[in-house]
Amino acid sequence: MLDVMKHRAPDDSGIIDDGKFAMGMGRLKILDLDSPNLCPVTDGELVMTYNGEIYNYLELREELTQLGHEFSTESDSEVLLKAYRQWGDLCLDRLNGMFAFAIYDGHQIFLARDLAGEKPLYYRKRAFAFASERKALEGCIEFPPGHYGTYDLQTGHLTLKRWWFPPTKIRGLSLEDAVKELDVLLNSAVQMRTRAHVPYGLYFSGGIDSTLISTYHSFEHRYTYQEKDYKEEFLKVFPKILYHLDLPTTHFSPFGYWKLAEEANKEVKVVLSGEGADELFGGYVRYVPNEFNRQAQQHFPSYKGIFPYTDMMWDEFNGNLRTLLRIGDRMAGAWGLENRCPFLDRRIIEFALALPIEYKIKGFETKIILKELIKKRLPNYEIKEKEGFYVKVNEWIGSKDGFGKTDYMRLQKQLCKKS
């Protein structure tokens, strides 16, 4: 299992087996580069496998030290294990980070995943096992984001519980105050995500999201997808991309993220990106009222549209965003990189979900609060039409009559057969 996933954790690996249960872990070294014996992490009683980063590990370490805990490494993984020992499952509410981890105490296994699903986790009920990628575990299902679970070795029963709940009330604050608060939160999120003992960079498209991130930190390394005719390379490497994705995709973006990660791999081990901004702050064109809604609102002022914006965004957060996170994680992992997303800081997620909808979308205007924030930080910034990392797959394969999702899926099947 570890060998199949070695690409995402190339620096170290190890296995602990007590005869009842075995746990293995690979490591991509980001913090505390010199400490040995961190795969898996153990204190002699608890054993932990862990994928991710706890961004507020320094603050938690200080709190745990005051509670009497001693540390032998500078790693966030040791902080996480001691946080679990101190607070049990309640430690999850103290974590600011992306994570999927499992802790074994000789009798049961505790598993948990971050609230947005940034880090992957899959499990199999029959002959219980878990892994970070589907390819390592036949017959597995996805562990839900924002949940924890306890597997009892004696009974063979797994209990799942939600540990994170979205805010249910809309806050009453002015747009000006909201912009100020987001400014502070985003600054903190970026600073925490640049805590690393290795070089790091930024996926930079020039759009609002990545440009905002760049205003809070001076990034020596920036990576932008270059639009070229990649037809031959696309056809050659796409089977590899599908292998790392584990599943077919209707998105054209994986090749773009593959190229970005390939370039970033030459210089850094960590990249920041703008995932989550569109889903949380209303960045998609489909949020803009269509002509039917526009006419209906003119004639019937009380008409609010067929689909409430808030419900649409929540569906995006739980649907499209998870797909994009899977793509970003797998393409970065394929090149031994770690992808970090400041907009998916827990504080920003909860802030965004509690914002009045008119601070995100109003009429035909999208991402209102982000546009106000970038005006504040970069007064001369020219807001451009959203592009992202656009990959022209339909043009490369010579389709004159359009290239739909069905054609794309058929192409993937053909490429996999040839590889």
Identify the function of each model-found stretch:
Residues 76-77, 96-98, 253-258, 278, ...:
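Conserved glycosyltransferase catalytic-site signature
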Residues 226-261, 265-268, 286-295, 334, ...:
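ATP-dependent adenylate-handling ligase core
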Residues 1-245, 257, 376, 381:
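Cysteine-centered catalytic environments shared across enzyme families
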